[in-house]
Amino acid sequence: MKRALLIVILFSLVVPFAASSRATAANDEATIYRDEYGIPHVYAQTLEAASFAIGYAQAEDRLEELLKNYRKANGTMSEVFGPDYYRSDLIQRMWRHSEISREKYNEVSPKMRACMEAFQDGIKLFMKEHPEQVPKWAQEIHPWDVVALGRYIIWGWPLGEAGGDLQRGGIQPDPAAYRGSNEMLIAPSRTAMNAAIAVIDPHLSWYGEFRFYQVRIYAGDYNVSGVSILGVPFPSLGHSRYCSVAMTTGGPDTSDIFEEELNPANARQYRYDGQWRDMTVRKEKIGVKKGDAVDWREIEIEYTHHGPIVAHKDGKAYSMAISYSKEIGLTDQVHEMMTAKNLDEMKRALARLQLMSQNVMVGTVQGDIYYLRNGRVPIRAKGVDPNKPIPGNTSATEWQGIHPMSDLVQITNPPTGYMHNCNVSPFGMMKDSPLVPEKYVSYIYNATRTATRHQRAEMMTDLLDATNKVTLDQAIDIAFSPQVYHAELWQARLSKVIAITPEVTVTGGVARPGSNSFSTDGGAVMDLIRGWNRRSDAESVGALAFYAFKKSLAPDVA
């Protein structure tokens, strides 16, 4: 019997419609209803017409952010917003997002090209109708900017992995951004309504390119609710009438650093299989705004056949290889995922391997729950350690293709009847997880059994494992639980430290245990923590004190 899939979207509420407008594209009419939160609900006969309306709505809501996202992807931010963006612009030019997206645009399916073009027509119509809202620095936009933006979003994950390889080679890379999220799936066998429950809970910034745009789309067979990136027409997180899609950061290793041996007589040659090869050199001009003027800097970017040179040390050059470097298929894959009618169709879409490294979780109306540790993973040569720079002077260390999805860590309908991923290894997703590192290639699993164990994950496992016949309200309570797991351990440690510290007299002749180790204010903060109920309720002073204490130990500890 077909089951109805219950989706708990933590960032979405269905509410009465409050306003509407109409948009027309290619002789098709679309209607945009806005609920009381301003979220657009788009109704259209065709996906192209819906795309036009979504473009109009995005521009109406956050035009400047949308245009900034395209500038970020194309590496043109610093010419408008100054030198703080120069380094990022250089990285995007290095990877040629705009150029590759333009050159390979016709490889995108005709359906998605039509949608991207209609989407941008909607943006342009709003700009034409409301010139007073168009920033002076607004650039001309092109359909392939959507493709370039997808590449830009993907790149954050493999760049971070490769940065770790550089660091282990003794080179300090640019710091990688920390990204975290929660997700969980509960199988029909453990729910009160005999249907799967999915929770999608991304923890990304309210600022910048990862500030999501929420939308609901009804266009023929396309019926999707979720969030997208500004400048992209369709959601990648959310649900259709058939499947839900959630993601959290984590996954296989999809990038490498190659150590290149340079010719002492010609620094733009590198040794490969006993011969000197010429590097490819590309010139770029990047503008940097200084006051009212723009300083145009001409730079030269060097490439080996592995990828761009990103560092030099001790006469060696270090090139970066990313498995997505020539890929432009993300838009098509996301569309296939959001139109999949069952798990088999979803797996076929995921097998395109266009998504960045993510813990992907899928629920279906048929009652299936599925996990994939997703990524476009290069097949490394035997004996190569991809966690540090790889010798680049021999064909023996070359990538040997891309692992098919069947090689990746995945599970369908686990025996626990639930699973979650809060940025943990697959072993930490459920009690007695069968997804152990010993079963997989190390760089595919890319974690240990205890990797990134933390209170979010342990709390989720314990709460899910203790429940049965879960109701919708119970699932929401689990997702929103204000309990701070294991805070009692910190309270006990603080009490022990204070208890063994000699008493001294404080102002007014009042003795405080351990006050010689704390200022008066510090002692008061410790008292707040020790007397706290270990809940992060909005009004909790103890929770704030605990957070400040943890942040004082290390920026990422809290």
Identify the meaning behind each predicted range.
Residues 1-4:
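Positively charged n-region of N-terminal signal peptides that target proteins for export
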Residues 18-26:
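Boundary at the C-terminal end of the N-terminal hydrophobic targeting segment
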Residues 549-558:
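Charged, long alpha-helical assembly modules
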Residues 7-16:
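Bacterial N-terminal signal peptides
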Residues 375-376, 546-550:
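Extended amphipathic alpha-helical segments with heptad-repeat/coiled-coil character used for oligomerization
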Residues 12, 20-21, 228:
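Serine residues within intrinsically disordered or low-complexity segments
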Residues 26-507, 518-522, 531, 535-538:
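Mature extracytoplasmic enzyme cores
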